[in-house]
């Protein structure tokens, strides 16, 4: 597999090198590697606390390299492309076993009519590619730092990834307002089972409508999205209700500090849409269950000592919405999650920076195991530091 990927990569680079004079083509990327300490108390009888010290990559920002380019094809009209890969710099692994895991998209851009994007693209409620609206635009730690430093994806379920077979339309910017429309005909074609068919109700699809508004120090993002779930083993073969979520976020730059605030309402979110911490043994990994609830985040960045201080507080309340499997085996339950993160980034040069951070995440789970009722309050602590280089 790796040999095939290497051959494909070499061919792609050779092709782009030959065409570089005809279009504006750029190679770019970043490498983020550091050290990490975690302590996890699962608050479960018979489950030992876990303490570990390890090297990790992509702690503050996911590692990547990519190719992007544009070409003028007429008055006010351009064609463009974006190919973006993600990898582990601690072990050299390829994320998700995909050559271009983060983005593989082609774009038609018109000054008058907006932009059309086709291919594997960031969902609107993500920070991926040219189509993601969330990420670092709306939270100081983007999706997260490390494993337990709370960012959006650990308190807001679903949507923080690219999707396959995606079409996105971005309107022209009008008085600071831009509209975004998106539809994925099959969210994960690579991981799909043989019986899943693109565009059919046998596979997961997704639609989203978003809007952004920017005026001076104010930036606002709103996204309404829904996963059209296919029939899965997770729901015993039943066709689960489609999820629905509404997310709203805003930032305000005061100059001496930048304030971030965001919130989300969600319903019918299957358990797999939650980025739960397995070591914490929270109940959000329960099978055959969907959830509804709310999430809130409040954060800030402050220039200090030549760098930037970051802080973020996140909270989520998720309660069982629907139960699709009646079994004595599966464990699930309502869960509250709260987390706090504090970090500092210091630039060493135009390309390099050093960062440090610490965070704590705590779940309060009222679990239901049909043979027994129980609850748990797992908690995790994390301290990390690393170096990041852009090119």
Language-model segments: which ranges?
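Gram-negative bacterial Sec-dependent N-terminal signal peptides
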Residues: 1-22
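Detector for outer-membrane/organellar transmembrane beta-barrel domains
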Residues: 208-342
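Transmembrane beta-barrel strands of outer-membrane/channel proteins
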Residues: 29-37, 83-85, 120, 181-183, ...
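Hydrophobic, lipid-facing positions within transmembrane beta-strands of outer-membrane proteins
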Residues: 61-65, 102-106, 163-167, 205-209, ...
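Outer membrane beta-barrel
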Residues: 23-37, 52-188, 203, 212-219
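Residue-level signature of outer-membrane beta-barrel architecture
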Residues: 69-71, 108-110, 171-172, 213-215, ...
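Repeated loop/turn-to-beta-strand initiation elements of outer-membrane beta-barrel proteins
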Residues: 77-79, 112-116, 176-179, 217-222, ...
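Outer-membrane beta-barrel "beta-signal"
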Residues: 377-391
């Amino acid at each position: 597999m790796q040999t095939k990927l290497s051959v494909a990569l070499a061919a792609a680079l050779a092709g782009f090198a030959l065409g570089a004079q005809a279009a504006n083509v750029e190679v770019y990327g970043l490498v983020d590697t550091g050290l990490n300490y975690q302590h996890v108390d699962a608050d479960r009888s018979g489950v030992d606390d876990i303490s570990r010290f390890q090297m990790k990559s992509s702690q503050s920002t996911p590692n990547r390299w990519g190719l992007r380019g544009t070409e003028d094809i007429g008055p006010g009209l351009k064609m463009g492309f974006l190919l973006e890969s993600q990898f582990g710099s601690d072990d050299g692994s390829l994320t998700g076993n995909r050559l271009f895991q983060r983005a593989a998209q082609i774009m038609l851009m018109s000054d008058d009519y907006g932009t059309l994007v086709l291919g594997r693209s960031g969902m609107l409620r993500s920070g991926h590619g040219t189509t993601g609206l969330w990420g670092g635009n709306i939270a100081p730690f983007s999706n997260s730092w490390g494993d337990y430093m709370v960012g959006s994806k650990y308190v807001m379920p679903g949507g923080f990834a690219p999707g396959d077979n995606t079409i996105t339309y971005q309107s022209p910017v009008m008085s600071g307002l831009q509209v975004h429309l998106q539809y994925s005909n099959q969210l994960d074609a690579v991981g799909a089972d043989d019986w899943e068919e693109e565009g059919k109700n046998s596979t997961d699809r997704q639609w989203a409508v978003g809007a952004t508004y920017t005026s001076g120090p104010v930036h606002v993002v709103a996204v309404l999205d829904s996963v059209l779930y296919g029939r899965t083993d997770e729901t015993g073969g039943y066709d689960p209700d489609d999820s629905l979520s509404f997310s709203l976020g805003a930032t305000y730059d005061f100059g001496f500090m930048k304030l971030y605030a965001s919130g989300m309402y969600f319903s019918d979110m299957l358990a797999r849409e939650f980025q739960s911490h397995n070591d914490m043994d929270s109940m959000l990994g329960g099978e055959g269950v969907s959830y509804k609830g709310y999430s809130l985040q409040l954060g800030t960045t402050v220039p200090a000592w030549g760098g930037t201080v970051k802080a973020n507080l996140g909270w989520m309340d998720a309660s069982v919405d629907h139960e699709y499997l009646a079994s004595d085996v599966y464990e699930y339950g309502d869960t509250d999650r709260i987390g706090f993160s504090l970090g500092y980034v210091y630039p060493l040069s135009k390309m390099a920076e050093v960062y440090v951070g610490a965070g704590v995440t705590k779940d309060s789970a009222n679990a239901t195991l049909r043979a027994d009722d129980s609850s748990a309050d797992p908690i995790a602590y994390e301290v990390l530091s690393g170096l990041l280089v852009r090119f």
